[in-house]
Swiss-Prot record:
A Pfam family of this chain: ACPS
Protein name: Holo-[acyl-carrier-protein] synthase
GO biological process: fatty acid biosynthetic process
Catalytic activity, EC: 2.7.8.7
InterPro entries, A to Z: 4-PPantetheinyl_Trfase_dom, 4-PPantetheinyl_Trfase_dom_sf, ACPS, Ppantetheine-prot_Trfase_dom
Subcellular location field: Cytoplasm
UniProt-recorded Gene Ontology molecular function terms: holo-[acyl-carrier-protein] synthase activity; magnesium ion binding
Main enzyme class: transferase
Gene3D superfamilies: 4'-phosphopantetheinyl transferase domain
Species, as recorded: Chloroflexus aggregans (strain MD-66 / DSM 9485)
Described purpose of this protein according to its UniProt entry: Transfers the 4'-phosphopantetheine moiety from coenzyme A to a Ser of acyl-carrier-protein.
This protein's record includes keyword Lipid biosynthesis: yes
Length: 140
């Protein structure tokens, strides 16, 4: 069985948040590893990289069927992951991968998710992420 989540982000919204709130916004949304990874991107592509990671966090939350804490003033009755609970990191080959902790990891374990795949892409204006979660039902 597969679960899928996709999210599209306007790069300008991330750029505006960084310009307005600076390090406070970056530290709230991105882990230290994510911030460091985006810092090595050329300045012109930094906002695209940040937007793609934001989209990945949202897409992963959608694939898991959970929300993200801190993204609005609405109340929900299901678990919500913190923004740092879903981390976009690179593997040894440079491919983006997801590292889950907290509510995100607990939910993935409860759903018996065996693997996550993430794909990121962006233009100057938009960033998109797709997350596929694989559940092994062979033992069911």
């Amino acid at each position: 069985m597969l679960y899928h989540g996709v999210d599209l982000v306007e790069v300008r919204r991330i750029r505006q948040a960084v310009m307005r709130y600076g390090q406070r916004f970056l530290a709230r949304v991105y882990t230290a590893a994510e911030r460091a990874d985006c810092e090595i991107a050329p300045q012109v592509m930094r906002y695209e990289a940040l937007a793609a990671r934001w989209a990945a966090k949202e897409a992963c939350a959608k694939a898991l069927g959970i929300g993200l804490r801190g993204l609005g003033a609405f109340t929900v009755d299901y678990p919500r992951a913190g923004l740092h609970d879903i981390e976009v990191v690179r593997d040894a080959a440079g491919r983006p991968t997801l590292h889950l902790s907290g509510v995100a990891a607990q939910t993935a374990n409860a759903l018996q998710i065996r693997a996550l795949a993430v794909s990121l892409s962006h233009t100057d204006e938009l960033a998109i992420a797709s997350v596929v979660a694989w559940v092994d039902l062979s033992g069911v």
